[in-house]
């Protein structure tokens, strides 16, 4: 019987990137429109990428098994 491959969750694959050290990087949302009511600090912080917390990283790695 053939071995079954795991499927990559395509929405997660578009939103997360695994770095060389194994951390999972993501880009913050909510800064593409309706920005006039947001403060400059909030918009500036939204431009920076961030890393997934360790307690959630294992669940994200299950969604992107071939990128880990």
Swiss-Prot record:
The keyword Glycoprotein does not apply. Disulfide bonds: none annotated. SUPFAM superfamilies: L35p-like. Pfam families: Ribosomal_L35p. GO terms for cellular component: cytosolic large ribosomal subunit. Belongs to the bacterial ribosomal protein bL35 family. NCBIfam families: rpmI_bact. Keywords: Ribonucleoprotein, Ribosomal protein. It comes from the Bacteria. Transmembrane segments: none annotated. HAMAP family: Ribosomal_bL35. One of its GO terms (molecular function) is structural constituent of ribosome. GO terms for biological process: translation. This is Large ribosomal subunit protein bL35.
